[in-house]
């Protein structure tokens, strides 16, 4: 599996997942590399940060709109130290399931491999928020799908690279939805 091979050879890895599916992402992580999530410093981000810390996942405070340089430095340091960094490329404010172009700048700066992750469940609750945040109910069929590793292609335009990444994340999201039925 390309993802597992990337971990074994200590490549820089950024795992991306939609903002509405970040809650259960921590349960999908089962590798020896440390995992750190970029999480908003807002109150709701702090709740998530506290929850994932109990599962052994570190956090990087920041977002695409605040503390950009501080969080970028922390991401660069984490990747250099062989941590895997998790990012919601449509967060913290959307639009829902639309990747912002900041991820392209990040992978160009870091030369990281991007690996999409999505999940779904047979029974779930979607709350009425900008992202239609998903809560998975207990005692349920849960499916997580890891996508193909995507590397930045220097022969393509940045927006073409972004489309490749977004399409792969959408593919694994749709696949997880279908498998969870």
Model-identified regions with their sequence ranges:
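Membrane-anchoring hydrophobic helices of lipid-metabolizing enzymes
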Residues: 1-24, 28, 57, 141, ...
